[in-house]
């Protein structure tokens, strides 16, 4: 990829001369789709990013949100950071290193804000599970995430995994991170004062990851696994762990004025964006950069995406103290230049190789005005499998099967904050500094957004909010990772517009600010584009750290709360297994009131278990609830067994309660409540639908749901 003729003409006009090779490469990378969001930026204004608890919104390395005081409800002095990134193309070329460095990058984004990383979430998307190449990528990605996350001591506590044919040539690896800081430790990526020093801190610079930003802004071709391997970074988690602790010490000692991690476009990207955000410039001597490879030229030093590096703005009088911290943690430290009130200037070997306006470099890329075609929903053409066949196929499908094989590889309890572990609707982290539980949910469903991009994305937002509410928490804020194919194709761009508007509309309805995010386009390969995929990572808060599990106790009545409407089957796993088509299910009319009511119900002493109804429908929700305790469920009044069991209409929760009247009272005027049966001590699911009856032991269900683990072990 190279700077387009039209972009080159703009740059030449701005500079008043031809760009140097280093300048041309910098503009190529910083004006790429990956960095400049040229096709998506015009759409992102749909998101509401402000709110009473939002301290720092979009535009920094990570967002910052104040936690509520559990006694007063006012903002506390304890903040969380939220960020999300994609490492899609690199994870196709090299699944282990691509995924591992994705973790490292989002953790450093967290550190840039003066925060300590406390939790990770991974949302992963692959081709059909039956294909060997999909399994190869899946295993490599999970190994990369677990290796890096476990080594740095940050727990991966929640996430999602989805399989869909259209990811075969382009998997998605989306990783979110939550960090913890406070009002006195907050750092931003906005340079403060001319005369301050720019310090490159961390690992030495090599040639790995060269041109990674431009690589991420083009379609993958058939030879990507070999030809594009140099564009994939290689991580060192042990250096990252030292960097985390060193950064914590620097922030504690107030030695950092501003910070930016070195990710896309390397040193050139981080340093130019840092000063541009402050309306300033820089003078950088590239010869001063500590390097691990000989004979590196200016372009390589500027654009290499070597990992575990930070760019700090430091007061001159603090440079020695910063160097001492680097020495303590066996990390490199180079004073590479100064913050100025002029241009962004880089010299190498006594010559000026870059001299341009920092803001023009960082923010001057022209936006794309692209054509789009509005998606249409499919007609109804539903299959007619018998109920037993349908139940076993859907419960055993890789999309709905147990993901224990994934999360048992992650150290999800390191840090001693994990109160509710992976495998539930949402994770729950103990933030003792504020006395609140922090719920954390992440994911999307490509079947939903492939069927109906707008309504499917609305459902993604509502499902994440329902996951959080089912654990007794109220949504706080969200970040998104918007993944799409080649936006120059009108049908692809139409689907992408749909997921942007759908997420934005539902988050606005729920009063959940979308405080940051990431866009990844050109996820296209010779096999075609990916489904439009709006990964959403959402947090919520509640007093205390207790929550009802997604497992039955055996003592209560079973209720389904929420309105499934006509229970259409569009986007369902049933259709994925048996073919056919249908409209996407309608969403509830008052989702915000429903979420508040569910959170209240989850916190009742009489509530013993809660589990949202989503992927795989009510059938999978009931199967997942059964363990030592069982369920006797009677849906005899339902005329359409397939719809009632397999519709994935969101905004519904199964509740086990010893006080059903309290649940009905709280939902009066908000959403319907249906009594469907009782929890038992049998360890069996006894299910009657119409005139048909199904019966499965917990062991039967576990066997059906173990397809991933059994296949990969």
From Swiss-Prot:
Substrate binds at residues 86-89, 108, 233, 305-307, 520. It holds the Pfam family AIRS_C. Mg(2+) 2 binds at residues 109, 261. It catalyses: N(2)-formyl-N(1)-(5-phospho-beta-D-ribosyl)glycinamide + L-glutamine + ATP + H2O = 2-formamido-N(1)-(5-O-phospho-beta-D-ribosyl)acetamidine + L-glutamate + ADP + phosphate + H(+). Residues 1-17 have a biased composition (Basic and acidic residues). Gene3D superfamilies: PurM-like C-terminal domain, PurM-like, N-terminal domain. Keywords: ATP-binding, Cytoplasm, Ligase, Magnesium, Metal-binding, Nucleotide-binding, Purine biosynthesis. Mg(2+) 1 binds at residues 85, 518. It is found in: Cytoplasm. ATP binds at residues 37, 480, 517. The active site is at 34, 87 (proton acceptor). One of its GO terms (biological process) is 'de novo' IMP biosynthetic process. It comes from the Archaea. One of its GO terms (cellular component) is cytoplasm. Its EC number is 6.3.5.3. Residues 1-20 are annotated as: Disordered. GO terms for molecular function: ATP binding; magnesium ion binding; phosphoribosylformylglycinamidine synthase activity. Monomer. Part of the FGAM synthase complex composed of 1 PurL, 1 PurQ and 2 PurS subunits. Part of the phosphoribosylformylglycinamidine synthase complex involved in the purines biosynthetic pathway. Catalyzes the ATP-dependent conversion of formylglycinamide ribonucleotide (FGAR) and glutamine to yield formylglycinamidine ribonucleotide (FGAM) and glutamate. The FGAM synthase complex is composed of three subunits. PurQ produces an ammonia molecule by converting glutamine to glutamate. PurL transfers the ammonia molecule to FGAR to form FGAM in an ATP-dependent manner. This is Phosphoribosylformylglycinamidine synthase subunit PurL. It comes from Natronomonas pharaonis (strain ATCC 35678 / DSM 2160 / CIP 103997 / JCM 8858 / NBRC 14720 / NCIMB 2260 / Gabara).
């Amino acid at each position: 990829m190279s700077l387009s003729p039209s972009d080159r003409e703009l740059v030449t006009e701005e500079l008043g001369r031809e760009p140097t090779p280093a300048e041309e490469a910098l503009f190529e990378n910083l004006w790429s789709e990956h960095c400049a969001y040229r096709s998506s930026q015009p759409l992102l204004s749909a998101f509401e990013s402000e709110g009473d608890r939002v301290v720092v919104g979009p535009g920094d390395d990570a967002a910052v949100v104040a936690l509520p005081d559990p006694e007063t409800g006012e903002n506390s002095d304890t903040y969380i950071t939220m960020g999300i990134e994609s490492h899609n193309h690199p994870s196709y070329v090299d699944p282990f290193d691509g995924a591992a460095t994705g973790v490292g990058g989002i953790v450093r984004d967290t550190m840039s804000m003066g925060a300590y990383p406390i939790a990770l979430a991974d949302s992963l998307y692959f081709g059909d599970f039956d294909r060997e190449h999909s399994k190869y990528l899946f295993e490599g990605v999970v190994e990369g995430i677990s290796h890096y996350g476990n080594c740095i001591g940050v727990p991966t506590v929640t996430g999602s995994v989805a399989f869909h044919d259209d990811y075969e040539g382009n998997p998605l690896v989306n990783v979110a991170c939550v960090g913890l800081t406070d009002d006195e430790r907050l750092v931003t990526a906005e340079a403060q004062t001319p005369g301050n020093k720019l310090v490159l801190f961390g690992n030495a610079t090599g040639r790995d990851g060269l041109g990674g930003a431009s690589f991420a802004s083009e379609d993958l071709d058939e030879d990507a696994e070999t030809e594009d391997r140099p564009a994939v970074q290689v991580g060192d988690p042990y250096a990252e762990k030292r960097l985390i602790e060193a950064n914590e010490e620097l922030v504690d000692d107030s030695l950092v004025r501003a910070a930016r991690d070195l990710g896309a476009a390397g040193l050139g990207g981080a340093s130019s964006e840092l000063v541009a955000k402050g309306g300033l410039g820089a003078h950088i001597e590239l010869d001063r950069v500590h390097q691990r490879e000989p004979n590196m030229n200016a372009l390589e030093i500027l654009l290499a995406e070597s990992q575990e590096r930070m760019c700090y703005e430091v007061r001159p009088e603090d440079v020695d103290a910063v160097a001492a911290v680097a020495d303590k943690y066996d990390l490199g430290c180079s004073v590479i230049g100064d913050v100025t009130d002029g241009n962004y200037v880089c010299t190498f070997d006594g010559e000026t190789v870059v001299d341009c306006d920092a803001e023009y470099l960082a923010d001057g890329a022209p936006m794309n005005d692209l054509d789009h075609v509005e998606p249409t929903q499919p007609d109804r053409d539903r299959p007619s499998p018998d109920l037993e066949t349908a139940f076993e196929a859907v419960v055993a499908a890789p999309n709905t099967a147990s993901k224990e094989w994934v999360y048992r590889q992650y150290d999800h309890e390191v840090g001693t904050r994990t109160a509710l572990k992976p495998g539930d609707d949402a994770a729950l982290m103990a933030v003792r500094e504020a006395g609140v539980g922090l719920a954390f949910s992440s994911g999307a469903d490509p079947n939903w957004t492939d069927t109906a991009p707008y309504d499917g994305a609305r459902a993604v937002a509502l499902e994440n909010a329902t996951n959080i509410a089912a654990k007794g928490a109220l949504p706080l804020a969200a970040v998104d990772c918007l993944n799409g194919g080649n936006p120059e194709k009108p049908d692809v761009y139409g689907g992408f517009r749909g997921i942007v508007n759908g997420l934005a509309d539902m988050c606005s309805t729920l009063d959940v600010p979308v405080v940051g995010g990431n866009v990844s386009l050109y996820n296209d390969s010779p096999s075609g584009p990916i489904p439009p995929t709006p990964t959403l990572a959402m947090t919520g808060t509640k007093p205390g750290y207790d929550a009802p599990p997604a497992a039955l106790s055996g003592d209560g009545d079973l209720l389904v709360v929420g309105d499934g409407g006509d229970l259409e089957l569009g986007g369902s796993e049933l259709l994925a297994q048996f073919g056919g088509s249908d409209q996407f299910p309608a969403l509830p009319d008052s989702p915000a009131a429903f979420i508040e009511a569910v959170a209240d119900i989850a916190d009742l002493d009489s509530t013993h278990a809660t589990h949202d109804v989503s992927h795989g429908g009510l059938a999978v929700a009931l199967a997942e609830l059964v363990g030592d305790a069982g369920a006797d469920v009677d849906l005899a009044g339902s005329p359409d067994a397939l719809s009632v069991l397999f519709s994935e209409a969101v905004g519904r929760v199964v509740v086990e309660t010893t006080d059903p009247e309290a649940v009905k009272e709280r939902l009066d005027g908000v959403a319907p409540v249906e009594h469907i049966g009782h929890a038992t001590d049998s360890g069996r699911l006894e299910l009657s639908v119409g005139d048909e009856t199904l019966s499965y032991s917990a062991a039967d269900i576990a066997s059906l749901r173990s397809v991933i683990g059994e296949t990969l072990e």
